[in-house]
């Protein structure tokens, strides 16, 4: 469809035992070049197949630092760096979760070659998209655009993929392999929760400041 550009953003999920002896889940993405890029907070991106980067907040909560080893599926990986994912400012495993969990759930990225190996066992077909007309003016416009896109996706799924670019990208969809989730950016808690929470905190702090000024004026007035 001419209105959007679709990007594969596949991932696999693996578990490992943390230093607290509890099971941790990592959502591991393929190396990204175009969308949902990473910010390197410490170390470097993986260069070798036995290297991995993980979210900095998840790493801090699990006392993991650059250079540490993680054993996943019987293979030992070196944490080459700590990063911040632009699409995971908070660790929501599912968009419907009431609260994020950055202790037991984190996101990670390996090399393209290692991702191919990991994805041989299981793979989640996740896609991202951008609007070719640019960013929507506000949440109202984005909702309209995303609703229109959803209608197109449903039509493509019903036709088993179709001949369009969108249909080709979503050609894996059929009666037995449908859409599990559809989350536009404005409704994505993992992307927006931190900013929304900061905004609500600002309002609370301003209210507290006004009350404090009133109390001080009463005491010293």
Spans of features found by a protein language model:
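Membrane transport/envelope proteins' first extracytoplasmic loop
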Residues: 1-221
């Amino acid at each position: 469809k001419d209105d959007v550009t679709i990007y594969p953003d596949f991932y696999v999920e693996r578990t490992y035992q943390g230093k607290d002896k509890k099971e941790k889940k990592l959502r591991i993405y393929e190396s990204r070049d175009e969308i949902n890029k990473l910010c390197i907070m410490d170390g470097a991106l993986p260069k070798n197949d036995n290297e991995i980067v993980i979210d900095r907040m998840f790493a801090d909560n699990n006392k993991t630092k650059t250079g540490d080893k993680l054993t996943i599926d019987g293979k030992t990986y070196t944490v080459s760096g700590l990063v911040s994912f632009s699409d995971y400012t908070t660790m929501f495993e599912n968009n419907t979760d009431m609260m994020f969990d950055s202790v037991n759930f984190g996101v990670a990225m390996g090399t393209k070659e290692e991702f191919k190996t990991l994805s041989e066992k299981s793979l989640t077909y996740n896609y991202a998209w951008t609007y070719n007309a640019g960013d929507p003016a506000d949440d109202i416009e984005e909702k309209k655009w995303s609703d229109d896109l959803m209608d197109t996706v449903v039509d493509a799924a019903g036709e088993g993929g179709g001949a369009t670019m969108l249909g080709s990208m979503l050609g894996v969809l059929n009666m037995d392999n449908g859409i599990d989730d559809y989350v536009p950016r404005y409704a994505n808690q993992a992307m927006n929760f931190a900013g929304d929470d900061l905004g609500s905190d600002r309002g609370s702090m301003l209210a507290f400041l006004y009350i404090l000024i009133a109390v001080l004026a009463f005491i010293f007035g």
